[in-house]
């Protein structure tokens, strides 16, 4: 399906110069002279290269539809992650860097959605939010109202997030996987 260059949104998969790219960041610019354009930071889904491209409103690009399948995360071994197709029970091993920073939030038995292009895994989507345990939290400085009231804390998966002062070690919290931010205390 063809779309205008200014209709590209973050997360869209497009075909550009013979490659399959995911739009990562978008910035709409309207200079004083000339027509408006969309500055798009893209990541190649096959080889991981990044590219910044300027699309004018008159340009069109092909939007690619990916197939999605439900998988379950089984285990990690070194830099390899093993998933199981929930329909066929087939196992597939993927490199950890395909998931980027989100790989730290994988938990045994977690359900994920895998995006496939021509039967080849392109990306893995985790749930937007997961539960994690605080293993270390800095002390709160009383009376410090001039600055933000959040403090740094370390999760059980090694990721550091900013949490409210009432959160202490051993507390289970809900974390946004892609923003790596505190959402709320777990129930």
Swiss-Prot record:
Protein name: Elongation factor P
Subcellular location as annotated: Cytoplasm
Matching CDD domains: S1_EF-P_repeat_1, S1_EF-P_repeat_2
InterPro entries membership: Elong-fact-P_C (IPR015365), NA-bd_OB-fold (IPR012340), Rib_uL2_dom2 (IPR014722), Transl_elong_fac_P/YeiP (IPR020599), Transl_elong_KOW-like (IPR013185), Transl_elong_P/YeiP_cen (IPR001059), Transl_elong_P/YeiP_CS (IPR013852), Transl_elongation_fac_P (IPR011768)
Name of a matching Pfam family: EFP
Pathway annotation: Protein biosynthesis; polypeptide chain elongation
PANTHER family named among the record's database cross-references: ELONGATION FACTOR P, TRANSLATION ELONGATION FACTOR KOW-LIKE DOMAIN-CONTAINING PROTEIN
Molecular-function annotations in GO: translation elongation factor activity
Source species of the chain: Rhizorhabdus wittichii (strain DSM 6014 / CCUG 31198 / JCM 15750 / NBRC 105917 / EY 4224 / RW1) (Sphingomonas wittichii)
Family affiliation: Belongs to the elongation factor P family.
GO terms under cellular component: cytoplasm
Biological process terms in GO annotation: peptide biosynthetic process
């Amino acid at each position: 399906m063809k779309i205008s260059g200014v209709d590209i949104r973050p997360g869209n998969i497009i075909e550009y110069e013979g490659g399959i790219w995911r739009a990562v960041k978008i910035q709409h610019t309207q200079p004083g002279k000339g027509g408006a354009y969309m500055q798009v930071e893209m990541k190649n889904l096959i080889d991981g290269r990044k590219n910044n491209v300027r699309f004018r409103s008159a340009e069109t690009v092909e939007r690619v539809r990916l197939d999605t399948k439900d998988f379950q995360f089984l285990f990690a071994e070194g830099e390899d992650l093993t998933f199981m197709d929930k329909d066929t029970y087939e196992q597939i091993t993927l490199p950890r860097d395909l998931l980027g920073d989100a790989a730290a939030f994988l938990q045994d038995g977690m359900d994920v959605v895998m995006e496939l292009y021509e039967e080849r895994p392109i990306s893995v989507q985790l749930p937007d939010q997961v539960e994690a345990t605080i293993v270390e939290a800095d002390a709160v400085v009383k009376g410090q109202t001039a600055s933000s009231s959040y403090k740094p804390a370390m999760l059980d998966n090694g990721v550091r997030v900013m949490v409210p002062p009432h959160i202490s070690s051993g507390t289970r919290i809900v974390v946004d996987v892609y923003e790596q931010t505190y959402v709320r205390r777990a129930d």
